[in-house]
Structure formats: C-alpha cells, structure tokens
C-alpha cells in the first residue's frame, strides 16, 4: 500500500488579522499614553519646582533689604521691589506680582481709634503671586510672609487711606480693582490692589497731600466709580481726588454694581421702525454740583433699522429727549424717566412722528401710585381749535382685598380669587399680611388674584408693589410674586422673572418676563414669608404696567399745532377733573399732569 503525505499550510484569516492589529494598536496607544503621562508629570513637576525656587528668590530679596526699603517702586510703602515683572527660567515665562501692605496692628491701638496709634505702620505683609503663561497644568501660587522692624516705632509723618466699595444695595464688593495714583510726588505713586471680603482696602502710611490721590474702582462686568479733578467744567466735583492728612484717616466710599443693557427702538404708533432717530440720553447721577454735572449725558442715534443696543450701562434713572431734525417724540414705553436695575436688560420704545409743525405730548400719572394713568379723556382747545383723545391704558392693580375670595375675574377690585387661609385681609382694611394666631404670626401664606383683563393683546412691562421696605426681622425675601398670563382666561401657569416656575419677583419695580407679551389676561400670586413670629410683611397695593402694541401708557400727543396758549381739560371717573393752560411756542412741548383720586 502506498501512503501519500500531504502538507497543509494555513495562514491568518481577515478577521484574525483585524483583531491582531487592533490589539497591537491598543498596546501601542497604552504605552504612548503612559509615556506622555509620565512626561507631563515630570514637565509639570519641573515647572512647579522652578516656580517655588523663584518665589524663594523673591522672598530672600525682600528679607535682605533694610526694613525701610521693603516696599514697591512707586507704591505704598515705597521701596526697592517691583510690583509686576516677567521672569524667565528654563524656557518658562513666569509672571511675578509682588504686593506689600503696611499693617496697623490693633495690639497698640489703631489710627483714628482708641487708643490712637500715631505710628500705625506696625509691620509689613509681603505677598508673592506667581503664574506661568507657557506651563501645562500650572496652578498659580501665592506665598505671604510678615516683615517687622527691629527698632522701636516713632511717630508717623504720614496718614492713612481707607477705601470701601459697596454695590447698589449697600453690600460690600470684594475683589474690586482699586487703582490709585499720586503724581504730585517724586517718584509718582501708583498702586493697583483689590478689596478684601469686607469690600475694604487700607493704605497705611500714605504721604500727605491735598486732592493728590486719584482713585478708580472697577471690576469685570461692573460699573466704574472714581474721584474727579477740579476743573473749570466741574469746579465742585461730588467726589474730588482724595486728601491725606498727617496722622489722620481719610475714608472714601465707592459704589459699583453689575452693568445693564438698554435695547432702544424708534418706531411709529403702528410699530413701524424709524431709522436714524437722534436723541439725547441723560442719567440722574451727578459727578459735580453748582453747576450740576451729569455722570452720563450723551447724544445717540438709532440704526437704519430703528434699533440701538447700549451695553455697559450703569444702573440709574434715565431720560430720553428727542433732538431729531425731522421727527418729534409722541410717547415712550415705558414712561420716562425710566430706571434700570443692576444686571438687567431694559427695552425702551420711543414712539415718534414727523414734525407738523408743533407737537404737545401730554403725560398723565396717578397721584398715589405715580404710574401712567389709562383711559383719561383729554380735550385740547384754543380759539378756533379743538381736539380730544384718551390716554393709552397704563396700569391695572389692586389696593384692597377686604371683601375676600371667590372672584374669578376682577370686576370688584376689593376681592381676589383664593388664598391658603394664612392671609389676613381685613385688619387693617386695604392691606394684606400674614394671619395672626393668638400672639404669633404664621410663617407663610399666599394669595391668588382674580384675573385682570387688559382689553387687548398686550406687552406687559413691570410689576410693582408697596411698601417696598419691609420689616428686616422677617428675613429676605419676605415678599414674592409670580405672574400668569394667557389669551383666553383659561389655564394659569405662574412663573417668575426668567419665565420658569422656580423663580419669583422679589424686588419692586421689576420687569415682567417678555414671554408674557402677546397675552390679554393676567393673574398674580402673592407669597408672604416671615422668619419670626413677632413680625409680618404687608402689602398695601400691587399694580402692573402694560401697553397695547405701540400705544404708550398714560400718554397722548397732539400734532399740527400753531403757536399759542392752549387749554387742557382732563377727566376720568374716580379722579378730580383738571383744567390746565399750556403754552406752545416751540416744535415740541411736554406737559406732565398728576391726577388725584377723589
């Protein structure tokens, strides 16, 4: 028998090849990542070691200087050290910032205190901060040391400058940037520092000088406050450059807060845009008196689309005045002057029409609430002339809840829809507050209003209430409000200023969330809270302002007037009728009338 032997050679299949390559790549990537990880650790460690060595080097320089020379060039205290410098070590670029402060130790009294320390610069704090611009994973380092004199103190020949920074609510602002210059000494003094957690910066042992210290306080996304030079244009600044007096403390307060935005549009009364409308925008804050010098006073112009956005606006009360050659202002929405709160966005519509030739703008306000008054009948007459109209709806609201709950629509303004039973509405009449059980107020309660009908599709502007100031002991917030709107009076979804159910209006004079625009009916839900049982917040009135399309609230204009003296007759049910004379001698005249309830 013949035996045949066959050799069979097998190779790798495609699947086996792919799997093998994948495994190989995983191993290679793992090895590479491990190598890079070790490399990065070594790299980061090396940069940190260099930074620590650099800090020690700077501290040794400070330690080896005479005490009188431990200070900053052009700084306070004055000395040999440089405030900011870039140092290179092994291809690393380090930014080194040195800050030195005189410290007034309370052990022997403080300047201006009891006892009064006539030599307040007891010791110095040296702070070295280092950062690296081209290092990977580098965390900035800060090292602080204390330097004290060897000898006994002697009476100081300098003074002290204490700077406090607050926000619009009076709260201290920490980490505010403070820039100080004194160019009346040689070398000039230049200090850049920040406020502490209490919003304070203390400069001890400052060289005396009259109106010598220029101070500017800033913070990212905040407004700016500063001292001003005495000039011919501003002979009496409200906050002149600081004066330092021998062995005295000069204290200055600065107020800064978050910047806001104005969205301004120039339109007709049918909401058609009017391009390139010129106007003057003025704030109410003063930087000088006798004569008054405004902090903000600028001329502006809207775009070709009739729009203008002004960012970086400081909180203030602003007035818009038309200076356009072809158009007059016939109304604004909201009513001017308008206030903008810190960190907010305010939409303003300036309603204009062509000059023809003279225009009278009549503004009617409620004498109690101070808000624009709707449905006022206005008649303007002169010999051979008569015209009449009605002011646009301005506000709806409530000043009495004494007739209780159970009313779905606000036909009786002394009633409301419902409450949780913890609201007192009759003692006193005209106010709502937390219910009192025996001698204790309940901790919280809420009330839902009847529905208010604005009469047409509306743009809702602001929610307001009084009193604004509530008992401090009740906590904060102690008054909260949510708003619900719809177009048919059906479903009510209550929301806050960001359009969600988790937020509340907690400050009076708040802008209503724009998502409510386009609706007709409104309800509010009032929440009262107290942190104690001995006091309660109270509300005497709640009201909201709105407009229908581009009809300005509480305003009416008359155009095509000739020069002369006109008679105004104004009447509205529930108010004292008024007759007023108005001279019209220029192209645009504004007359504000306050209506007093009967």
Task: Annotate each PLM feature.
Residues 12-56:
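Aliphatic-rich helix starts adjacent to a transmembrane/signal segment
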Residues 45-171, 266:
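Low-complexity, Gly/Pro-rich coil/beta segments used as flexible assembly/activation regions
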Residues 390-549:
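Beta-strand-rich ligand- or partner-binding modules
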């Amino acid at each position: 028998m013949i035996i045949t032997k066959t050799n069979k050679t097998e190779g790798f299949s495609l699947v086996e090849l792919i799997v093998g390559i994948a495994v190989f790549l995983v191993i290679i990537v793992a090895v590479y990542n491990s190598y890079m990880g070790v490399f990065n650790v070594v790299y980061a460690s090396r940069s940190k070691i260099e930074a620590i060595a650099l800090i020690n080097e700077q501290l040794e320089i400070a330690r080896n200087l005479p005490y009188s020379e431990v200070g900053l060039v052009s700084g306070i205290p004055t000395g040999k050290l440089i405030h900011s410098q870039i140092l290179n070590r092994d291809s690393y670029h380090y930014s080194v910032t040195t800050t030195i402060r005189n410290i007034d130790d309370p052990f022997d009294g403080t300047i201006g205190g009891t006892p009064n320390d006539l030599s307040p610069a007891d010791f110095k704090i040296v702070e070295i901060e280092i950062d690296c611009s081209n290092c990977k994973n580098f965390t900035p380092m800060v090292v602080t040391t204390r330097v004290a004199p060897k000898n006994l103190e002697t009476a100081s020949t300098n003074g002290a400058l204490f700077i406090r920074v607050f926000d619009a609510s009076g709260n201290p602002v920490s980490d505010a940037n403070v820039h100080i210059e004194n160019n009346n000494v040689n070398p000039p003094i230049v200090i850049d520092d920040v406020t502490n957690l209490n919003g304070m910066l203390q400069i001890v042992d400052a060289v005396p000088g009259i109106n010598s210290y220029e101070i500017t306080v800033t913070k990212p996304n905040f407004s700016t406050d500063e001292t001003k030079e005495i000039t011919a244009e501003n002979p009496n600044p409200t906050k002149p450059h600081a004066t330092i007096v021998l062995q005295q403390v000069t204290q200055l307060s600065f107020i800064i807060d978050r910047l806001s935005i104005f969205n301004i549009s120039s339109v007709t009364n049918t909401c058609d845009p009017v391009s390139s409308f010129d106007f003057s925008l003025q704030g109410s804050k003063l930087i000088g008196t006798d004569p008054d010098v405004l902090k903000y006073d600028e001329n502006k112009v809207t775009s070709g689309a009739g729009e203008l956005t002004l960012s970086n606006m400081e909180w203030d009360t602003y007035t818009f005045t038309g200076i356009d050659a072809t158009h007059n202002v016939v109304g604004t929405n909201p009513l001017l002057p308008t206030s903008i709160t810190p960190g907010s966005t305010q939409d303003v519509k300036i309603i204009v029409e062509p000059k023809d030739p003279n225009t009278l703008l009549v503004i009617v306000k409620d004498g109690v609430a101070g808000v624009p008054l709707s449905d006022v009948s206005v008649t303007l007459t002169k010999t051979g002339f008569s015209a009449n109209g009605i002011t646009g709806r301005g506000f709806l609201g409530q000043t009495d809840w004494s007739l209780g709950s159970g009313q779905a629509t606000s036909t009786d303004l002394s009633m409301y829809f419902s409450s949780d039973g913890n609201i007192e509405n009759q003692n006193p009449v005209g106010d709502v507050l937390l219910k009192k059980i025996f001698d204790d107020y309940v901790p919280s309660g809420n009330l839902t209003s009847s529905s208010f009908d604005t009469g047409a599709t509306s743009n809702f502007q602001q929610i307001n209430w009084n009193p604004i100031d509530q008992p401090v002991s009740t906590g904060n917030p102690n008054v909260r409000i949510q708003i619900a709107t719809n177009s048919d009076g059906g479903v009510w979804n209550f929301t806050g200023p960001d359009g969600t159910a988790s937020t509340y209006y907690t400050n009076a004079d708040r802008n209503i969330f724009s998502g409510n625009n386009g609706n007709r009916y409104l309800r509010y839900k009032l929440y009262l809270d107290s942190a104690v049982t001995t006091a309660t917040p109270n509300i005497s009135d709640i009201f909201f302002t709105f407009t229908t399309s581009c009809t300005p609230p509480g305003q009416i204009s008359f155009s095509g007037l000739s020069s002369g003296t006109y008679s105004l007759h104004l009447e509205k049910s529930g108010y004292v009728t008024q007759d007023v004379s108005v001279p019209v001698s220029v192209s645009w005249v504004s007359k504000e009338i306050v209506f007093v309830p009967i």
